[in-house]
Design a protein with these regions (language model features):
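C-terminal helical "tail/cap" subdomain of flavin- and related membrane-associated enzymes
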Residues: 2, 65, 80, 301, ...
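Conserved N-terminal helical subregion
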Residues: 2-4, 47-167, 171-184, 228-247, ...
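Residues at the starts of beta-strands that form the adenosine-phosphate
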Residues: 3, 26, 216
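Conserved mid-domain beta->alpha element of the FAD-binding
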Residues: 7-22, 26-33, 153-154, 181, ...
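Short helix-loop capping/hinge motifs at secondary-structure junctions, enriched
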Residues: 61, 187-193, 228, 256, ...
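Histidine-centered metal-chelating micro-motifs
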Residues: 160, 180-182, 205-208, 294-295
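Active-site substrate-recognition segment that forms the wall
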Residues: 195-231, 250
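Flavin-binding catalytic cores
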Residues: 233-267, 325
Length: 403
């Protein structure tokens, strides 16, 4: 039986491990974090194409009961004017729509399912290097141990070590010029329909919120930030700083943003975010990248998790059907690259719209309604309607099995 080592137990890693096991490859996942350390970040949306890809592997149930449906988004200007409403993707045939869920719940559910299916997940195992050896790939870990497997999958996120190993000259990830913050406010009246995202292009910053079942308000904020913060800079600014900063940004808008933030208990943190416009080498010497390691996208795309899941499923199909490992990786890249790079580009455009200056803001508010209409129709066709057929054979050099 062939063996695989997957680096990273975020979203792509556990799903890839399940797909590889189904393809007849015994898989171990090595994750840098210690078991108890749960993931930073508040919540994310999983779109219908991501849910469909989970179902392709027979694991759609993992997201049932841990999130809530969020079928649509309403865009407003800071004056409260409605600019447009788009769906988060046409429902799947059984009526399922995109869901919003806590990041930590999604990670845990995927890890638990992988372990239930016989995948070994080792925590506290940080990959530091890897190289091709006669009988496969030898991975070296920070704890001094080595493991050899037939192939290695880099599912180690935007700051991927595997990416550097595959291409030591790979450019670093690109800073996205808005920060990300988020939280959960207790039930309160914000005048919004449950499950519908309210997305506000405020005068100074973008703000999004959605009412969850039970009435609590899940929110995120995008303070503009032109230059990349120094390491540790954001963490050194405490909750009082961020509360004051958000108040300054949102007090000029006619939205419930300040009330929501004031009602949010606990600490507030900000994250810098990055994307990867085009990673030139996805694979080499039996090592391959998937998920954010290959194509990190701005959170504005709302697709990073779904694309990571799609990657994992397609990699499983390619390794199942294409006997030679590096040829299977080339087939995988052929199936995935143009699709994910289109999403990265769309995400970057959305982030820039969030950080617009005064003139661009006026134009945006004029043209956004038209753009949203067009974008909504286009996304329905190629983005959300994407379906992977697990049973369709992959032929090296062809793109069979996806629509
Ligand atoms: C603020 C924010 C909001 C977002 N919102 C959304 C959203 O609404 N919808 C959406 O679809 N996407 C969203 N995303 C993007 C989404 O989170 C990512 O696209 C997704 O997590 C990618 O999954 P991944 O498995 O490739 O990487 P990750 O989830 O980052 O997982 C990588 C894993 O690898 C581990 N690792 C790293 N280095 C090593 C190493 N050397 N050795 C071993 N393990 C290692 C890490 O600890 C981590 O567990 C958001 C991102 C951010 C930052």
């Amino acid at each position: 039986m062939r063996t695989a080592l997957v680096i990273g137990a975020g979203i792509a890693g556990p799903v890839a491990a399940i797909a590889l096991q189904r393809a007849g490859i015994a898989t171990t996942v090595c994750e840098a974090r210690a078991d108890a350390a749960d993931e930073a970040g508040a919540f994310l949306t999983l779109q219908v194409n991501g849910i469909d890809a989970l179902r392709t592997l027979g694991i759609g149930h993992v997201v049932e009961g841990i999130g809530f449906p969020t079928p649509s988004m309403r865009f407003r200007s800071g004056t409260g004017k409605l600019l447009g409403e788009v769906s988060t993707g046409a429902p799947l045939p059984d009526g399922t729509v995109g869901v919003t869920l806590r990041r930590s719940d999604l990670y845990r559910a995927l890890r638990d399912e992988a372990e239930r299916q016989g995948v070994t997940i080792e925590h506290g195992r940080r990959l530091v290097d890897a190289r091709r050896v006669a009988d496969g790939v030898r991975a070296e870990f920070a704890d001094g141990t080595t493991v050899t497997a037939d192939l290695l999958v880099g599912a180690d996120g935007v700051r991927s070590r595997v990416r550097q190993v595959i291409d030591p000259d790979a450019p670093p990830a690109r800073f996205v010029p808005v920060l990300n913050m988020g939280g959960f406010a207790p039930a309160m009246d914000v005048g919004a329909a449950p499950g519908t995202y309210e997305m506000v292009f405020g005068k100074r910053a973008f703000f999004g919120y959605v009412v969850a079942p039970g009435g609590s308000v899940w929110w995120f904020a995008n303070p503009p930030q032109r230059t990349e913060p120094a390491p540790g800079e954001l963490a050194s600014l405490g909750t009082a700083h961020w509360r004051a900063r958000l108040r300054e940004l949102y007090s000029v808008d006619r939205t419930p943003a300040c009330r929501i933030i004031d009602a949010t208990p606990g600490e507030l943190r900000a994250w810098a975010t990055y994307d990867l416009p085009s990673v030139r080498r996805w694979h080499r010497d039996r090592m391959v990248l998937i998920g954010d390691a290959a194509h990190a996208m701005s959170p504005s795309s709302g697709q990073g998790a779904s694309m990571a899941i799609e990657d994992a499923v397609e990699l499983g199909r390619c390794l199942r059907d294409v006997p030679e490992i590096d040829t299977a990786f080339a087939a995988f890249e052929g199936l995935r690259r143009s699709r994910v790079e289109q999403v990265v580009a769309d995400g970057a455009r959305s982030s820039n719209a969030k950080a617009a200056g005064p003139v661009a803001r006026v134009l945006r508010d004029l043209f956004l309604p038209i753009f949203l209409k067009r974008q909504g129709d286009r996304a329905a066709a190629w983005l959300h309607g994407h379906h992977i057929d697990w049973d369709a054979p992959v032929v090296a050099g062809a793109g069979a099995g996806s629509r």
